[in-house]
Every structure is written in C-alpha cells, then in structure tokens.
Amino acid sequence: MVDYGGTVIVALSGGADSVCLLHNLVLLKDKYNLKVMACHLNHHLRGEESNSDMEFCKELCRQNNIELFVKEVDVDKLSNELKISHEECGRNCRYEFFNFLAEKYNAKIATAHNSDDNLETTIYNMTRGASLKGLSGIPKVRDYIIRPLINTSREKIEEYCKGYGLKYVTDSTNLTDEYTRNKIRHNVIPVLKEINPSVENTVLQMNSTLSEIAEYIEKSGQLLLKIAQSGEGYLTNKLKDANIVVLKEAIAILEDAIDVNEI
C-alpha cells in the first residue's frame, strides 16, 4: 500500500478506527522509514462537539509528534447552497482536502474504513440499485487512497484500542437513526448477524468476486471499442453482435470519456 520511505497521511476523525490506524502507523514508521502525518476536517455539524473532536486530534498528534493538517468547513451552510445532503457535501469536502494533501506532499491518504463500513456501504448501494462496481464494496486501494483496516471488524478495532489503552471520541450522530447508514447499522446489520455471525467476511468475499467480474467486463468493453473503432467513430457491424453486457459497458466507457451532449 505504501512504499518503503513513503509518506502517508491518516484521515483522523478522533474515533476508534482512525486512532487505531494512526497508532499502528506510528509503531511501524521506523521499521519502514515512513513519514506519517494526519489530517482532520471539522464539518461544524455538531456544535461544540465538533470543536472538541478537533482539539482531541490536535492533542493526540502533539503527543505522538505527528504533523496535523486541519481544515474547517461549514457543511450545513455549504450543503444548503449546493442543495445537496450533509453526507454528500461532507464527503466531497473530505476528498477535496485529501486530493490537495496527496498532491502537495506526494502522499498516500490512509482512511480507517473497516469491514463493518464495507458491509454498510454494500447494503446501502444495494438499496440504490447499484452496478457491479457499486456492489464490489470499498476498495482497499484506489489511486492515492489506502484503507489498511478494511478487512478488520469494528469490534476488533475497539478491542485493540482497549488493549493499548487508547482514548478516542464518539460521534454522537452515530448513535441516532437520522442518517440512512445509521439505520442500516442499527436496524439491518444486527438481523443479518443473527443469521450469519460472519456476515462481514462473507460480504467481503462476495465483493471480491464481483470486483473480478466487473474488471473482466470493463476490459471486455474496452477491447470491443478497440475492435470496432474506425477513425473517430465506431463500426456498428462490429458492435451489434456483441454480448449485451459487454456492449452496455462499452457505451458506459464512451459516456465517461465523451460529453454525451455532444454525441
């Protein structure tokens, strides 16, 4: 995930997951000659609690001699201006921040997504009628983003923190059913775990299989376009007999590459 001597910036919320991740990397940084830093985005959605979490992260990094980058955004105001949800706005702000830091410091950004997060995301995407890619789960690596804890359960992470005596904060909004993901976490997943106590691992295996299928279809779509290409266009006689799934993928690839309004 990170090359020897590389730079990694931990997305630090102050919760158990990111505290565990930072602690792991601090323990490993000398062995692998890593430059470890951290970043924190204050969404200002929880009043004083948001500020308290930010100060917690500052103190944690000070104690571990870790450089911390902090950005503050009024997500409520911005989401209203853009007419999008708090969740979408917050995510956009986070990844904009990550992209800036990754480019500036030639760094990998380590997020603390775990196997429970992956399960929640997969279920959420199912309810939205997601494609194969959407059902492939949260990738362990995507561009500059790495997720070292994606195969580790939230329970194991909390046990780790307890074992090392690590303090962390709890986001009060995670305790309510205000957000869709929380409804899934509190109401759907407990039932699934009654049916299959290892459901996180089962879904991870499913994600892996679907990811391989999605990759095969994507490569097949790319090959079809290569075969059918003629100058700046494509020969319909080369496309019409193609497998419908591969043809749909080829069209999706074109839509991603070309402004559909100009076709």
Where do the model's predicted regions map?
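Core alpha/beta nucleotide-donor-binding catalytic domains of modification enzymes
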Residues: 1-187
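Short coil/turn residues that cap or connect secondary-structure elements
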Residues: 49, 130, 195, 243-246, ...
